[in-house]
Amino acid sequence: MSDVKKVVLAYSGGLDTSVIAKWLQEEYNCEVVTFTADLGQGEEVEPARAKAQALGIKEIYIEDLREEFVRDFVFPMFRANTIYEGEYLLGTSIARPLIAKRLIEIANETGADAISHGATGKGNDQVRFELGAYALKPGVKVIAPWREWDLTSRETLMAYCEEHKIPVDFSTKKKKSPYSMDANLLHISFEGDQLEDPWTEPEDDMWRWSVSPENAPNEPTYIEIGYEKGDPVSINGEAMSPATILETLNKVGGANGIGRVDIVENRFVGMKARGCYETPGGTIMMKAHRAIESITLDREAAHLKDEMMPRYAKLIYNGFWWSEERRMMQALIDTSQKYVNGTVRLKLYKGNVTVVGRQSDNSLFDSKIATFEDDAGAYDQKDAAGFIKLNALRMRIAAQKGRGFLDNDK
C-alpha cells in the first residue's frame, strides 16, 4: 500500500467518509486531500472543513457546483427527455460524473496519485465513480474502502471512531433517519429499512420535499416556463440561472405534491433494488420539455429521439457519461434542440402536472392545415387516397400471397 503518496477523497463530513479519511491515513500511510461538493443537497457543507482539519488534513476543497451541475449535466440529460425504466429521472446517477470529474481535476492539481470514495460494494455508485475516473485519467488508482476493510456496520464504524479518536459530533452519531438517503438539486432518494420489503408502503413522514397529493392545495397553481434551445431559461417571464430555475420548480412542485415515485429498479451490478424518489422540479421540466418539443420538433426527429432515449438513459444509469457513445448521442440530441424555443404553460394540482398551453415562434403547428373547419384548400383530402394505397401495398401483396390474419385465410 506504500505506493500511494496522496489520495483525493470524496468527503461529506459524515461518519462514513470521516472514518475513511482516517483509515486511508492509517492503512496507506498517505496524505489525504478532501473534496466536498455542494450540489444542492440542502445541508451545510462548510462544517466539513472543520471536521477535515480535525483529522489533520491540510488540503481541503469545498466547492459550490450547483450551477455547473444543472447547466452541464441535468439540462443536457433533460434535452433527451431521459427516464430510466419508465419512472426514474436519474437524480443520483447524473451527479456522479461531475463528482468524478472534480476528483480527477483535483488529483491533477495536487499531484495526487489516487482517489477514493465511500460507495459500497453493492451499489451502482462505485461503478459510476470509477468508470468516470478511468475515462478521465486512465492510470489513476482508485481506493474503495468498503471493498477492502472489515467495517461492515454502523456499530463497527462508531467503534473505529472511538478507537482512533475521530471527532464525530452528536448529530452525526445519532441516526436521524432509518433510510439511506442521497440528495442534490434534482432529487432526494430513500432506500433501505422498511423499503426493503417491496410490499410495504412508505410512511408519509419519510418524504422531505413534497406534501402528499391529498394534502396539497385545493386550488391549482399555474406557471409558465420559457425555453431556448431545449433548456429552461425563465419562469413566469423572469430570467433565471439554471440552478435557480430548478430550485424554484422544486419548491412550487413540492408544494403541490408533485414528483414522488416508488420503484423497483434493475441495478447495473445485477440485483433489483427498491427506491423512493422525490423529483418535483424534474417532473415539471420533463413534462414542459416534451410539450415545447411537440410543436417545434419534426415528427421523425422526435421519434428518433424517443428511440434513442432508453439507450441514453441506460448509459447514464450505468455510469457511462464519459464514454464516446454518450458524447455521440449528446451531439445528435443537442442538434435537435436548435428550434426548441418558446413557452409552456402548466397547471400543477395535487400531484399532477398538466400542460395547458404551448407557443413558439418556431412552431411547426399550422392551424390552417390542422383545422376541422374549412381549410380554404390548405390540405387536399383527396391526396390521402394515394398515400393510403401506397402504404397498404406491401400488406395487400402479403394477403394475396396467402399470408392472411383471419381464421379462414389460407
Curated annotation (Swiss-Prot):
Pfam hit, one: Arginosuc_syn_C
Alphabetical list of NCBIfam families matching this protein: argG, PRK00509.1
InterPro entries from the UniProt entry: Arginosuc_syn_C, Arginosuc_syn_N, Arginosuc_synth, Arginosuc_synth_CS, Arginosuc_synth_type_1_subfam, AS_cat/multimer_dom_body, Rossmann-like_a/b/a_fold
Taxonomic lineage: Bacteria, Pseudomonadati, Pseudomonadota, Gammaproteobacteria, Oceanospirillales
Positions contributing to ATP binding: A10, Y11, S12, G13, G14, L15, D16, T17, S18, A37, G118
Residues reported in the UniProt entry to bind L-citrulline: Y88, S93, N124, R128, S180, S189, E265, Y277
Subcellular location: Cytoplasm
Keywords from the named record: Amino-acid biosynthesis, Arginine biosynthesis, ATP-binding, Cytoplasm, Ligase, Nucleotide-binding
Enzyme category, top tier: ligase
Name recorded for this polypeptide: Argininosuccinate synthase
